[in-house]
Amino acid sequence: MVLKKKKKEIQVDAFSLDCQQLEKLQGFSKAEEQNLASLLLHCAQLSNGIQQIQCIKQIMPLVKAMDQNSACDPMLKACLEILGETYFSLNMKNPLKKVLASSLNGLPEWFMTLAVQSFVCCLREELKTTDVYLYRKVLDNLASCMEDFNLGRASITNLFEEVLQFLQKALLDIQEENRSNNGNRIVQTRLMHDLLMAIKVAMMLVQKLQENIQGSLWKNHESFVWQSMCNLLKSSSDFLMDETLLQTVQTTSGLAFILFTKAMYEPAEELPSLVSDLLCGSRKLASMPAWFVNNCGALCTEQLSDSVLLFLCHGALAMLDWKSGSMGENGEKLLLDIASVLLSLSSELKESSMATSLSRILAIWTNSALAALIPDSPNLKVKLNGNSEVVGKLLEYVYTHWEHPLDAVRHQSKLIFRNLLQIHRTIIAASDEKSDPFFARLTRRLLSLEWHVKGKYASLACLVECLGTENILQLDRSIPVQILNVMNDQSLAPYASDLLETMFTNHKVQFTSGSQKSTWIDQWHDVWVSPLLQILCEGNHDQTTYIIDYYLPKLLRCSPDSLSYMIRILQASADANLGSWSTRGALGALMACLRTARAHGHLELSNIMSRGLVSTESIKQGLVHQHNQVCIDALGLLCETHRSTEIVSVEEMQLILFFITYNLNSQSPSVRQQICSLLRKLFCRIRESSQVLYKWEQNKTKQELFEDSPKRNPLGILQKYQDFLSSLCDRLFEALFPGSSHPTRFSALSILGSVAEIFSVQKGQEQVFRLDQEINSARVRTLIQCFASTFEEVKVLAFELLMKLRDVVFXLQDSESLDLLFQAAMDLSTSTKPYDCVTASYLLNFLAYHEDLQHICLGKWIKHNPQMNEDTSVGTVEKNILAVIKLLLVNVEEEIFQAKKSLLQAAASFPMYGRVHCINGALQQLPLNNLMFVTEWKQIVARLILMSYELSAVVSPVVQSSSPEGLIPMDIDSETADRLHMILKEIQPQDTNDYFMQAKMLKEHCKIQSEKLAEHKPMENICTEMRGKESQICDVTAQMVLVCCWRSMKEVSLLLGTLCKLLPTQASSEPSHGLITVEQVKNIGDYFKHHLMQSRHRGAFELAYAGFVQLTETLSRCNSESLRKMPEQWLRCVLEEIKSCDPSSTLCATRRSAGIPFYIQALLASEPKKGKMDLLKMTIKELMSLASPSSEPPSAIPQVHALNILRALFRDTRLGENIMPYVADGIQAAILGFTSPIWAVRNSSTLLFSALITRIFGVKRGKDENSKKNRMTGAEFFSRFPSLYPFLLKQLEVVANTLNSEDEELKIHPSLFLLLLILGKLYPSPMDGTYSALSMAPFXPFIIRCGHSPVYRSREMSGRALVPFVMINEVPHTVLSLLKGLPDSASLCIRQNNIHGTLLQVSHLLQSYLDSKQLGNSDFEQGLSDIVTCIGSKLWLAKRPNPCLVTRAAFLDVLVMLSTHLGNSQKQGMQFVEFWEEMNRVISECELMTGIPYLTAVPGLVQYLQSITKLVISVLSVTSAADIQSSSSPTAMKIAKPPLSIVHLLHSEFHEVRLLALEAVLLWLKKVNAKQIAKEGGVLCLLVDLEGVLLSMTLKEKNLECFYKVLEILYNMDLRNVLPKIECSIKMNPNEFLTWSLDIMDNSNSTEVRSMALKFASKLVVHLLENHQQISEEVLKKWVQQLIYFCGDEQETEMLLAAAEVFRSITSLLLISEKLVLGLSDTLAMWKCVILLLQNEDLVVRDAAAEVLQVAQAEKKSSXGAGFMFRVMNAPLALDLAFGTLCEQLQQWGQTCAGIPVLLEWLLGDSDPRGGLEPSAPEEDECLFDKGEVNFWAEKLTSARLLGKHLLLLAQATHLALPDGGELDRLCRRAQDQAQLTARLLTALPPSPEFLKTAEFTKLAIQNEQISLCLKILNLLQSVGKGKDGNLKE
């Protein structure tokens, strides 16, 4: 829905006048009539700025009414003076200033002189300002005066010299002040912006008042104006050269420099030459004027930095006049020089802001070039046409930057490309674009790019704008479908949709402007709409979602009329194609189209209904669809609309309530979010439309003409709104029942929260609904009970809702219940279960808002502070929180005191972290900016800090232990205290920094440490068993100790971080105002430093890191310089400590440097990102020098620390693009570090390298390791990291030289792996041009030599790495050269490693060639033919003469690739008859034919067998093709009969061969079953008579994978073909075969095998029953039992899915048959399984089980005929229908007598209420993280209520055969006994059981409701029975 945003109310600050001005106005104002003075006086007395604006607008009419003689009126003079003073006093951004200027622009001519005098007077006063920090106001005023304000401009003209003088002074003063504040970032930033404004004002002065500075007069070099201009020029050149200034200041200085030079330089036509000389560094000082050299000496003489050159280029492009070649040949030369300079800078400037500037300036250059092109500039046309060098280099820039990580660079690349096309188009204006070779070549190259290249989309769009869509489509008609197929990737979807929009819009324009004006729409639909509809129906979830979000709205906007075509097509197939859980189907596509159309205003729902576009039933079907997104689209159709005040119809409200019933329990967070968001839109619409309805009601008498409009009865609609919202809230509160799932609670609370927020009472508005009126004490209790949820987001939502309703909530709570809640919170805050303290925190935060908290609850715990009670006006929350924190603090201080004596007792009885967590939570509720009890808070803060240190000291020995978490050794004998001694000994730190140098002598080391411990840590009162609060014995476990200590540390860290946030209040003038002192902050910093630098565990330093980040962020925002400098001091200290390599260093030296990288990360993250990032630069420089190997032999520790810290920094997303300039250096350090002899350095280098690969190529976005999504072109890579080109080339050469083929010695260079890994991430691009200085060719020979490595993996990687360095058209030549390098069979020296490496390289190159888009190209075919011929000459390598099986396998893999490709293009394949003959020869001579001669395992044997098998299968597939089999040509007959059959493969003794053969058979079988026989006709002949072979394999096959495949093939076969053969193949009859299938499930341990066996056995059962063949009762019973077993909640998903599939297949036959086929008990047991599957936690299982009900509904519809049936549904609806269908079946079978008691048993539950409620054994209590039920989706009460609903309906049915009275009495007695027991158990629970015994309370509450429901049905049945008995008696 498009909700129009309410315009923000403009805040206008009112102006006021001083006493003197007011007196002056009062003297002139007249009471009897309004004059100018009285108007101004009235205006000044207004306090509202908006009203003042209205008042000022009345000034001009009043002034214009005055005659010319009034110019001498002192009143007018006084008023103009006041107006001038007011104008200059107003802030620049105040709208009043603009309104005043606008009004004064209308001043009559005769008053101008007087007004100018007044303004000049005011401006002169302004220019006298001497305070640097007040300059900004003057500068703003000068800028305002020149901005469309006649008076202001006239005033500046009058004071031109004074203004110039002020500007010179301002520039110098601000620069000086900036230098004196070096290091004070806040002040410097402000001064920089002031300096920027001063430069801008100077430029405005020169641009807007040119007449004052041009002409002969001022160019006298002695004149003041000339001197002033010289000074301004000097300042601008100084600022331009000053690298310490902000980049924006330097950029603007570049503009100013060119502008000032242009104004001063003569002759003007020589100016371009001067700029060219500066840019090219020719420094022709003699030809430059002396004044220029004197003022800009540095620019003329020094070597200009890259940034200065860039800003000079920008200045020249922006400030010189390029239009129509006005600067002549010099201008053309300058234009080309600028391009040359910019392109040379592109390889140097890699820092993100500079790269962005460069791309923007290049785009400006292309605009200037376009402007400079005129018909009579042939030289420029030659230099700028598409084939020129300049354009070529610019295109290369575009190709290497169109996937740049910065959005701005990508956007500018697109603009550059578009402008380059326009330049070429302008140059070739006379000729046709279609035939132009430049455009043709560019189009071909772009289309041959892969679709994952984002730059392709924008560039193609530009090309479409130039050439037209039709010209592009003529090259490839499938482009629209290709682009739509790309849209399943969200990162590409926006680009794809933009390209599609450009194409279809352009196509439409082409059609409508052409000759086919009447018929174009059908063609347009075929191209753009039909593929869309097909994908919407059948596409995957992501693809359809992104198409609907990005593409569909654009398509409808372009052609709204296409909607009716889309609806017509989809409606026609909606009934037949309803979709499934994986596809939307036509129904889902229809919902999506209608939703989008309605949301964008193309349709209204009333029209949709009335025109029959979709029925209510169809929407209902959509609302409960299996596909989540169809449900959301159906809901969106109801909720979203273009008009925010459109009235919600009754149908919409009914459908929403229907939706809520079945969709609250969605496991998908995104679906829940969308539901809440859409309903929020609906509520907003109800609110907005209700306001309209209230207005209609007020104006009802005027609306009598509207007979049929809703205006007739507004109150009726409002009442319906109220009823709807009330019903909705009832359902939502009902959904918060005991045991409701987390998704249900989340959805219900979110929607209730939206209702409370949207329908909150606002002043002056009647509200249609108020949630607080729906609240009662039971609902309040329900909301408070949500705090007991183990999911924190539920607690958050409940808390927020209670806060919105707190007025009514607290009124409904009595003091006793509040007291119990407080007591529960205090108990939970010290619970040993970690999630209990979170509940306690929410309870305390909730109670803190209660006014009487202190009287009701806190009075028992702490003494009242009389001062606080006296002042009742003080905020309730602050008083309560202060009291709560005091209470918690007192408790925790006492507990810490006890913990010092015995940490173990604390862990078992009162873990302290819960109290601290509650303190933290309470602090979050505080209004920190507005505290009343500052003195008390100061004391509390000081105590909290001390408490934190003490608690940390108690627990840190455990946290900083060297033992991994949880691996504290445990003694089995819990009766002795030795274990506790062991715990405390083990948790002492035992690591030293000898980690790098020597292995630890662990036993001795531990022994010494233990002795020290024994000496220094005598323990008192240690025992294993301790009595807790409830006097029960509590056994201390290691987990308890660990949880207590780790969580305490975490809470302390967060608390200290929170307390640091109190620091900014310290910046006030009075130090006493702050709650925390500077000294305390420094101590906190030292505390964090200690833990970050010395902790060994990631967990420990991560906990400290969270708090430390808060501290550093706070310090960075401080006004106090000493505090602000602290992070920098800490950073320098730690870097020095790392460098020092002192053996006594306390730095933690672990494998990854533990917390040190975190420490440095936190310090750098606090540095402002928009500055120069000096700290980051300094740190990286230091670390790089440490990380790089040096010739001196220092300790390895600093190098390891440096590498680890660099890794952390490169992984830190907060540093963003600021870290990218250092990536190349990082790669070099990592690769060089990998050559270190020290393992620790190599390890850290590897980790750093991995982080850098991710930083460069992005996070892996798929399972495919070599996916092109995580790669980039070689050109782009070396363009972004140019320094890596020479480095990688040199390293590769060194590596290749170590692999000297002449040397027999085995040499492996350590860098080989990393080099090949990074080179393998690159890929070739058709766009790689000839203008790049970095050629890829030099890499190729070295990579080829790397293929000779003795390491298998390296050879494999070299094959992959070679691909990007060989252009596609070069592949055949390279492959031929590699193949020719292979030895002949007669060669003397055969090196198998070299052969293998070469074959792998051939394989990868060939694969890239066959995958390329060159297919069908004549060059491609010739290249392929040459390769096939050459391969034929080396075939000996695939045969027996080659003794190495590994290289034989590699050669065979190449043959398989060729065979598959040639087979797929059979027309081409038939040209290579010799190839196929050779393949047959290779197969006939292979070991599969002649037998395997190897007795023992031989290296590569399996690999060889797999490769030869793949070749056989490939050849079989090709030769089985129908055209070959039926052909009579001798060629075809030669190759039609391969030497090996599939049966031969299936009989192989090697399971690897059998497995591949079975996979091929399965694939062929599925193709046959999928009716692809037309294409795969020949496959049928391969499957003939396989049944017997497969059946015999079932008994013989020992390999599990093969056995599974055999079963799967049999399952997919037609049993009519299989069963006749079982007798002769395996000597079994069908019954025995079924028994054998069932036995597999008992005997196999494989889930896959058992699942397939169940499916196969079930298929057999169905087949036998349908064909009326006898199955023994025992076998059937066994089958049913297996089915039931498969449905257990604990079973694996695959088994559950198998069971669901079986139930679907037997639904018609057994579950809903007219007569019972199996016994009632078995049938009911199977129905119970279906119901269990519908409640499974796994969505896939639920969806599969829902298909059972879909089959049942479809069957019902076909038998019952008319009437609406749900034919595709989600699990909640299916569950409802399952119970309904079962009850109907019981009636149909006449089994209600026997069936109802069984269903009542289900309802009652067969478990004892006491189950799980008995006092647990101590060891059971040890589980600290028990979260209750395992299934987080199933809701027992939901299924109970649904079953109860259907049983009640069944009980009320007429002619019902009731169960026996005795049976009902037995059930009744049992239910009553259980009810009494449940009541007793509930009363036995402690107070507030919902919090203190949540699981037990929930279980009993559920059972209570189940029993009540059961008793209700029993009573009804008994009353019905008695009624029937009475009737019988009568």
Curated annotation (Swiss-Prot):
This is tRNA (32-2'-O)-methyltransferase regulator THADA. The keyword tRNA processing applies. The lineage of its organism: Eukaryota, Metazoa, Chordata, Craniata, Vertebrata. GO terms for biological process: tRNA methylation; tRNA nucleoside ribose methylation. The keyword Repeat does not apply. It holds the Pfam family DUF2428. Together with methyltransferase FTSJ1, methylates the 2'-O-ribose of nucleotides at position 32 of the anticodon loop of substrate tRNAs. It comes from the Eukaryota. Belongs to the THADA family. Keywords: tRNA processing. Transmembrane segments: none annotated. InterPro entries: ARM-type_fold (IPR016024), THADA-like_TPR (IPR056843), THADA-like_TPR_C (IPR056842), THADA/TRM732_DUF2428 (IPR019442), tRNA_methyltransferase_THADA (IPR051954).
